Curated annotation (Swiss-Prot):
Organism: Chlorobium phaeobacteroides (strain BS1)
Protein name, entry field: Large ribosomal subunit protein uL23
Quaternary structure (record): Part of the 50S ribosomal subunit. Contacts protein L29, and trigger factor when it is bound to the ribosome.
GO biological process: one example: translation
GO cellular component: ribonucleoprotein complex; ribosome
Pfam families given in the database record: Ribosomal_L23
Gene: rplW
Length: 109
């Protein structure tokens, strides 16, 4: 698989896991397996992964009431991966984002 990582999964629970236990949560492609996820994390962030836990999350069912009646639908299913890193390593999600904003402001002025 080319790149199984979609985006970091940032919630209160995942932030608490990161601060207390050094675990990071990511939304990944549904077809990704643990070895693909581990390889992608190590290549992208340059860290050593100790373990990977995955969970398949079902999409919520949605209903919309219209003049023509009830329209039922469903959000897409997705997969969540929780990564545990080796002791003393961390991932910075926001590296470089503030530098680009300052460069754009200085060019306009």
């Amino acid at each position: 698989m080319r790149n199984p990582l979609l985006q970091p999964w940032l919630t209160e629970k995942s932030t608490r896991l990161t601060e207390q236990q050094g675990q990071y949560a990511f939304m990944v492609k549904a077809a990704a397996d643990k070895t693909d996820i581990k390889r992608a994390i190590e290549e992208k962030f340059g860290v050593e992964v100790r373990s990977v836990r995955t969970a398949n999350c079902l999409g919520k069912s949605k209903r919309q009431y219209t003049r023509k009646g009830l329209i039922a639908g469903k959000k897409n299913d997705w997969k969540k991966a929780v990564i545990t890193l080796k002791q003393g390593q961390e991932i910075n999600y926001y590296s470089g984002s503030t530098d680009q904003g300052e460069e754009k402001k200085s060019k306009k002025g």
